[in-house]
């Protein structure tokens, strides 16, 4: 049979236009005109329908309240025709309600399917925490290895620094010894120079004494010549004077012998003194020469050792530079690895946070879906009650006027029942919402504890 199009609005659902086939017309996408779900079904399409109208009021003719007149009246036939029209309207409304109930059942099935899909997706997302923990453990193991390598490098650096300190102390000791030896060498050189000067002075004195000795010899010879000449003169005089018989030759010989003895003694003393001084100076010069030679040998040995120490210091410095470069490279690599680990840790934390946010969003969507499902269940129950009331009203055999009165009363009762069911719906909405919120908070707290 053909039905008329009607507009019925309830809660957040819009009116549905019925086709002659008795099924609602689907929209182009989503829930178009509150019909069947299209291919673009989403959580937003649940609230995309706007109410197109409200349930029309059932008007009661006041003349029906007048006591019945059993006489045949033309108004009775008119009243029956009016009741037939009302029955047709109610049948159309009933057919629209049946189509809406079917659409709501399909919508409920879609919501259940989506809820199961979201639960599977949430469990899969939650299972990724094991992979995150494994990757985090591997990064921590790498960080521990890098820390151990850094500790070993620091220990090697301390050993190298100790060796460098030991070589530095030895180098300072050698420098101090070299300084002492150089000071000793300078002192010995000063003593050698002083001895050379003294030797030169002694040689000069020896030459002066030899010159003085020659001079004294010349003087003595000249005096001897003078005395000889005087003796000759005296002898001549004596020869002339025959009265004096003085023997001057003996005196001259005696004086000459005395002078010769004095000159010989002076020469011997001078030669002995000069020889002793020369021997002493030669001994001291030989001693200083030996000490100088030993000092030169020691200086040569020290120079060789200094060269060796310098080469060792250069090699140690180069080794220290290489170790410092290796330490810098190791520190840079450790810092890069640590920074990479921190970045990966931050990425994992961001991914975990994003997963938590996705889980919370899915929980909120689930909560919204459950609220929508609850509202739809309440609407379905209300429609079932309305249909049961309509069926019970249609099944009761009674007179035309009484049925009309009863239908009006039932319509009023259905309105009151609708009001009661809507109030119950508002009351019952809070219970599951609170339960879902508590469940989501409990799940988020467990997830945060597991991540910690």
UniProtKB/Swiss-Prot annotation:
PROSITE patterns: IF_ROD_2
Ranges for region Coil 2: 252-390
Start and end residues of each stretch annotated as Linker 12: 228-251
Domain IF rod: 83-394
Chain residue ranges for the region called Disordered: 412-452
Alphabetic keyword roster: Coiled coil, Intermediate filament, Keratin, Phosphoprotein
Residue ranges with Basic residues bias: 422-432
Region (Coil 1A): 82-118
Region Tail, residue ranges: 391-452
Annotated region described as Linker 1, given as residue ranges: 119-135
SUPFAM superfamilies: Intermediate filament protein, coiled coil region
InterPro entries: IF_rod_dom, Keratin_2_head, Keratin_II
Note: There are two types of cytoskeletal and microfibrillar keratin, I (acidic) and II (neutral to basic) (40-55 and 56-70 kDa, respectively).
Family stated for the protein in its record: Belongs to the intermediate filament family.
Protein name: Keratin, type II cytoskeletal 80
């Amino acid at each position: 049979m053909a039905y008329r199009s009607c507009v019925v609005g309830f809660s957040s659902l819009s009116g549905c236009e019925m086709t002659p086939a008795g099924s609602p017309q689907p929209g182009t996408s989503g829930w178009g005109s509150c019909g069947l779900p299209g291919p673009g079904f989403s959580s937003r399409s649940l609230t995309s329908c706007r109410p197109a109208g409200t349930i029309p009021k059932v008007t009661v003719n006041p003349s029906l309240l007048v006591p019945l007149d059993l006489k045949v009246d033309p108004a009775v036939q008119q009243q029956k025709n009016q009741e037939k029209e009302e029955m047709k309207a109610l049948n159309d409304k009933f057919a629209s309600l049946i189509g809406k109930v079917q659409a709501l059942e399909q919508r409920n099935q879609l919501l259940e399917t989506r809820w199961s899909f979201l639960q599977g997706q949430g469990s899969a997302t939650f299972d990724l925490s094991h992979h995150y923990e494994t990757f985090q453990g591997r990064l921590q193991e790498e960080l521990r290895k890098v820390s151990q390598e850094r500790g070993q490098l620091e220990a090697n650096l301390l050993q190298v620094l100790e060796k460098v300190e030991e070589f530095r102390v030895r180098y300072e000791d050698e420098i101090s010894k070299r300084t002492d030896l150089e000071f000793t060498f300078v002192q010995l050189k000063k003593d050698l120079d002083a001895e050379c000067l003294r030797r030169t002075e002694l040689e000069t004195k020896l030459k002066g004494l030899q010159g003085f000795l020659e001079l004294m010899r010349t003087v003595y010879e000249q005096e001897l010549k003078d005395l000889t000449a005087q003796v000759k003169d005296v002898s001549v005089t004596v020869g002339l004077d025959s009265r004096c018989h003085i023997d001057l030759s003996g005196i001259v010989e005696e004086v000459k012998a005395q002078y010769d003895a004095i000159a010989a003694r002076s020469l011997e003393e001078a030669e002995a003194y000069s020889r002793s001084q020369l021997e002493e100076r030669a001994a001291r010069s030989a001693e200083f020469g030996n000490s100088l030679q030993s000092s030169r040998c020691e200086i040569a040995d020290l120079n060789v050792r200094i060269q060796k120490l310098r080469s060792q210091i250069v090699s140690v410095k180069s080794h220290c530079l290489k170790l410092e470069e290796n330490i810098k490279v190791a520190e840079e690599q450790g810092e890069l690895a640590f920074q990479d680990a921190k970045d990966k840790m931050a990425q994992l934390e961001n991914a975990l946070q994003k997963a938590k946010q996705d889980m919370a969003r899915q929980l909120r969507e689930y909560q919204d879906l459950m609220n929508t499902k609850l509202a739809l269940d309440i609407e379905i129950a209300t429609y079932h009650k309305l249909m049961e009331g309509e069926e019970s009203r249609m099944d009761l055999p009674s007179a035309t006027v009484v049925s009309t009165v009863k239908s009006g009363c039932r319509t009023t009762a259905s309105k009151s029942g609708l009001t009661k069911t809507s109030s119950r719906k508002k009351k019952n909405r809070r219970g599951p919402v609170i339960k879902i919120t508590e469940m989501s908070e409990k799940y988020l707290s467990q997830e945060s504890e597991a991540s910690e």
